[in-house]
Each structure stands twice: as structure tokens, then as C-alpha cells.
């Protein structure tokens, strides 16, 4: 595996927790394993390891994106990740509320 893959797997474990990552990797099939490798290398190893934003900020952005995309299962895991990254409950709540005004309410206008 590449250096980005290894760094990504480490960051993914730090953010999401070992149990979450072990479950994701353990549930991977021959068909989905390349997707797990891609996510580790490019999302976690390529984007989450960049120096331009603190991890807590990246977590809040991820929560906003998952809210806008209506991905409740992924959102649940990343709320735990945001807490692991030092985000407060208030910051998470305000991020979700702010995003909901734009991403969810506008579909009813």
C-alpha cells in the first residue's frame, strides 16, 4: 500500500475510532475492498492529512456536506468523529442547524 493509504488509515482510526474502521474494513467484500482502499488513500490520506484546515473544521464541513446530501447513517458516524476531533456539542448543533436552513428548507420553497 502507499504512504497516503497508511497515513489515511491512521487518521481514519483517530477520527472515527478503531471499532468503526474495523467494522468497515471487516465488512468489505472482494467487490467493495477497492472502494475502502480508495477512501483510505484519497479521502483520509489525501484530504484529511492536508495542513490547510484543522481537523475539527474538516469535521464540521463534513457534517454540513452529509446533512446537505441527506446521508443520516454517515452523519451519525461523523458526529462521533467530530467529537473525537474536539468539536463541542454546541458547535456540532450550530453547524447542523445552519446547514439545515439552506440545504433542507430550500427544497420546500
Model-predicted regions and their roles:
Residues 9, 62, 79:
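Generic structural marker for isolated residues within well-ordered, non-membrane alpha-helices
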Residues 55-60, 89-94:
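Alpha-helical scaffolds flanking conserved acidic
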Residues 30-31, 67, 85, 98-105:
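A short structural micro-motif
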